[in-house]
Amino acid sequence: MSAPTHTHSPLYLGLMSGTSADGIDAALVRFDDASHRRCELVAGITVGWEPQLREALVALGQGAEQMAIDRLGRLDAQVGLAFADAANQLIAEAGVAREQIRAIGSHGQTIRHRPQADPAFTWQIGDASRIAEHTGITTAADFRRRDVAAGGQGAPLMPAFHLAMLGASDEDRAVLNLGGIGNLTLIPRDGAVLGFDTGPANALLDSWCQQHRGTPFDADGAFAASGKVDAALLHALLADPWFALPPPKSTGREQFHLAWALQAMGTATLRPADVQATLLELTAATVADALLRHQPTTRRVLVCGGGVRNPVLLARLAARLPGVVVESSARHGLDPDYLEAMGFAWLAAELLAGRPANLPSVTGAAGPRLLGAIYPA
């Protein structure tokens, strides 16, 4: 756990669980002033899901289960309680008083994201009323749906936070989150910020590794490193028309899952390690292609999310981006493991300050909007 510091400024607590559903990230954050342009990670923890609950979330997230309303209602309550427990655990371990925390910002757990549907919708579960009730702290949640209601994708939401914390006046930058799904924030020295999903990242890699190695993720990319990229499979995967769509665009497990990869594989018989290497190359290729297509002047890519701990993936990405510095967001003072949770603490702070937090240039929304709903303590 990151060590806490102590001042009198209010704290915000961010809660995040991504498409990989590999745990709940909880981050205590302090902002420098009312503008919320600089922040400090006071403390952070990751709390694993109870195995049966994680199994249900993964199945629901990739569309494998059409869940009865009663079961979905219970799952919503269970996820809310798990988020509350993670917040309470962080507060206890950090040794801070609840009165110091002005609000919790909870992302929830995405179970469906259908921005192309008619009508478009996105759905995150994790009952925020229960978080407020069981922590005694005002909770902000449901950040994506207002952007969707305004004609946007509802994702990604982190580019506004990335711009506030990591923008630079002397170079064109990108922030790359390698979670279950990869997403890029393109931050030019001048001009509009662009942000969008790039396609599958850890979600496919983790699922294949779990199926063939019995481990939840590919530690240090060793499984992928032991295989060779299959050019035919990579070509088939890259042929998916989603990759050619222009921004704004977003996606999730419901589109990119193992059944999708197996369909591309067809009747070919491949070594599991070769498939893992190919899935890793798919992530590197789609990220690099998107970056070169939409901001070829990028000089620095700041990486966060679980993929930052995969040196094989980072090496392949760097090989596809000659002349571009690829480095962890930690080099710029932001812990890559908690950057998204910190971002949802920031979204809570912006909502309470009455400031819009979406970027229409990123999501395609009709205009700036206040994001989220407030559940009082």
Swiss-Prot record:
Residues engaged in binding ATP: G18, T19, S20, A21, D22, G23, I24, D25
The GO terms this record gives for MF are:
ATP binding; kinase activity; phosphotransferase activity, alcohol group as acceptor
This enzyme catalyses: 1,6-anhydro-N-acetyl-beta-muramate + ATP + H2O = N-acetyl-D-muramate 6-phosphate + ADP + H(+)
User: Does the entry feature the keyword Flavoprotein, yes or no?
Assistant: no
Q: Which SUPFAM superfamilies match?
A: Actin-like ATPase domain
What Enzyme Commission number(s) does the record list for this chain? 2.7.1.170
Q: In which pathway does it act?
A: Amino-sugar metabolism; 1,6-anhydro-N-acetylmuramate degradation; Cell wall biogenesis; peptidoglycan recycling
Output the GO biological process annotations, alphabetical, semicolon-separated: 1,6-anhydro-N-acetyl-beta-muramic acid catabolic process; amino sugar metabolic process; peptidoglycan turnover
Q: What class of enzyme is it?
A: transferase
- What Gene3D superfamilies has UniProt attached to this entry? 3.30.420.40
Q: What keywords are annotated for this sequence in UniProt?
A: ATP-binding, Carbohydrate metabolism, Kinase, Nucleotide-binding, Transferase
Superkingdom of the source species: Bacteria
What's the family?
Belongs to the anhydro-N-acetylmuramic acid kinase family.
Q: What does this protein do?
A: Catalyzes the specific phosphorylation of 1,6-anhydro-N-acetylmuramic acid (anhMurNAc) with the simultaneous cleavage of the 1,6-anhydro ring, generating MurNAc-6-P. Is required for the utilization of anhMurNAc either imported from the medium or derived from its own cell wall murein, and thus plays a role in cell wall recycling.
Instruction: Output the PANTHER family linked to this UniProt entry.
Output: ANHYDRO-N-ACETYLMURAMIC ACID KINASE (PTHR30605:SF0)
Recorded protein name is Anhydro-N-acetylmuramic acid kinase
Gene symbol here is anmK
